[in-house]
């Protein structure tokens, strides 16, 4: 058996259990999360963190003109010093964030899915004031992207329970 044939055989062997258990890709036609794409409107942002969150959610779910669902959210962030020098100067900060979110059916206003996601990022404050401000802004953007990805993952994972299309 050649190397190519062996790889093909192993690929088929790995795929068989997935087919046997009824595995369907989430975004496939008829898949549980297919109804999310280009059908979700995210509440308008009110600050930079909200803008970064909405931008990432729209990247992942698409921007819609005819929304079937709406995502509402509340962002909470805290900043704490992590790296402290012998002169009590903070050189590293940690930004922790949580988002409470709800997926709402536009037709009925029923809450289809809700949850809380959380994560953290860090940034260095040991450079110039300009680099510190830039690092902080980048850390906040990274945090919102992480949290948006967690929201989308949660919606995909639960879509089989609430998406009846």
Question: Model segments located where?
Answer:
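N-terminal export leaders
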Residues: 6-11
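Bacterial Sec signal peptide processing site at the extreme N-terminus
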Residues: 19-38
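Acidic/histidine-rich, surface-exposed loop or edge segments in extracytoplasmic proteins
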Residues: 34-45, 127-131
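Post-signal-peptide N-terminal segment of Sec-exported extracytoplasmic proteins
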Residues: 43-74
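Surface-exposed short loop/turn segments
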Residues: 64-114, 122-138, 145
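C-terminal/domain-edge helix-coil "capping" segments
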Residues: 134-165
